[in-house]
Amino acid sequence: MYVDPMNNNEIRKLSITAKTETTPDNVGQDIPVNAHSVHEECSSNTPVEINGRNSGKLKEEASAGICLVKKPMLQYRDTSGKYSLSDFQILRTLGTGSFGRVHLIRSNHNGRFYALKTLKKHTIVKLKQVEHTNDERRMLSIVSHPFIIRMWGTFQDSQQVFMVMDYIEGGELFSLLRKSQRFPNPVAKFYAAEVCLALEYLHSKDIIYRDLKPENILLDKNGHIKITDFGFAKYVPDVTYTLCGTPDYIAPEVVSTKPYNKSVDWWSFGVLIYEMLAGYTPFYNSNTMKTYENILNAELKFPPFFHPDAQDLLKKLITRDLSERLGNLQNGSEDVKNHPWFNEVIWEKLLARYIETPYEPPIQQGQGDTSQFDRYPEEEFNYGIQGEDPYMDLMKEF
């Protein structure tokens, strides 16, 4: 069923219980989905306006994430040189940013649609994002989960690096949230539950995501989520000191430059739930530095329409006391999943995608439909140039 996202009353008032079908759509299959905007990176603490939202990011100000205890490293899948530009047709631009673009492409071999993320090497080096770029490739080469984007391969020329990703037709959760203004409690709960399972999976592999927000959550053709943009994701078995993220969502321990662990994702998870329910984040201020002050010191307040269980969960996620933050305690993500707000969620069914979604994107053209993405001016691209590459040693894995 399709619904009008402009009308909250028409979003399905779902109870998060199982579908009646014996098998869910696309389970066990590779779903051809997902593209996302290349978000701007800040060269200072000044926020950048993207899609009408203050979504500036902080650059890395420490050299590398520091792990205090050595653990066996993850096994990365080799993705380099798996494809070349000649394997695809570039159809249109899906998103732009200071690093490059995301294009809708079509394979010349199997006819399927993909998203091609292009990043300019010169800009990556200039903005000191080499480590983040390499980490993004590494983390995406590890993960495999129903609610996380899939990267199929990478390649490069002398000026760009390229990542071939799933194309997700349904667009950003951010767009749906802005059209809806805010989500009813059951709808926010559905998306939060799927995000919770994705975070649980990442943390089981000692991966911190560090940039959870509606812009980085895509909806597939059936309305299930796909977390994308792993530009700040990192393998951290213990703690790290890297300063990065999106201001409204950054945990206080990151703002105060203290060592931190996976608990920062659970803080951001709480902020995400709050924004879905309220339509705004709890500590927002048009002045970014004031936002940071609010994160460190302001009282967490709730609109009167928040369900009591939602308030209780958010108090236990958006807490500065790490010894009380859900997800960071002895039982990890189980404490979050067992909270009363999630009582009716059947987690096994949700993971298997048996649960009916509250919203199905109005995709009319099938695979390759771009109606849920903004239009961008198309330019002449100098892709595929071979020649002297001063940055080859910095991005060998592409």
Swiss-Prot record:
Q: Which CDD domains match?
A: STKc_PKA_like
Q: Name one GO cellular component term.
A: P-body
Indicate the segments forming the Protein kinase domain, all copies.
88-342
The enzyme's E.C. designation:
2.7.11.11
Highest taxon of the source?
Eukaryota
Q: Which residues form the AGC-kinase C-terminal domain?
A: 343-398
User: Which EC main class describes this enzyme?
Assistant: transferase
Residues forming the catalytic site: D211
Positions modified as Phosphoserine?
Answer: S15, S55
Summarize what activates or inhibits it: Activated by cAMP.
So what does this thing catalyse? L-seryl-[protein] + ATP = O-phospho-L-seryl-[protein] + ADP + H(+); L-threonyl-[protein] + ATP = O-phospho-L-threonyl-[protein] + ADP + H(+)
- Which GO terms label this protein's molecular function in UniProt? ATP binding; cAMP-dependent protein kinase activity; protein kinase activity; protein serine kinase activity
For this chain's UniProt record, which GO biological process terms are given?
A: G1 to G0 transition; mitochondrion organization; negative regulation of cytoplasmic mRNA processing body assembly; negative regulation of cytoplasmic translation; protein kinase A signaling; Ras protein signal transduction; signal transduction
Keywords associated with the record: ATP-binding, cAMP, Kinase, Nucleotide-binding, Phosphoprotein, Serine/threonine-protein kinase, Transferase
* UniProt: ATP binding residues: L94, G95, T96, G97, S98, F99, G100, R101, V102, K117
User: Hey, which family's this protein in?
Assistant: Belongs to the protein kinase superfamily. AGC Ser/Thr protein kinase family. cAMP subfamily.
> What further note is attached to this protein's record?
Present with 1590 molecules/cell in log phase SD medium.
Q: Which PANTHER family match?
A: CAMP-DEPENDENT PROTEIN KINASE TYPE 1-RELATED (PTHR24353:SF73), CYCLIC NUCLEOTIDE-DEPENDENT PROTEIN KINASE (PTHR24353)
Q: What is this protein called?
A: cAMP-dependent protein kinase type 3
Gene name in the database record: TPK3
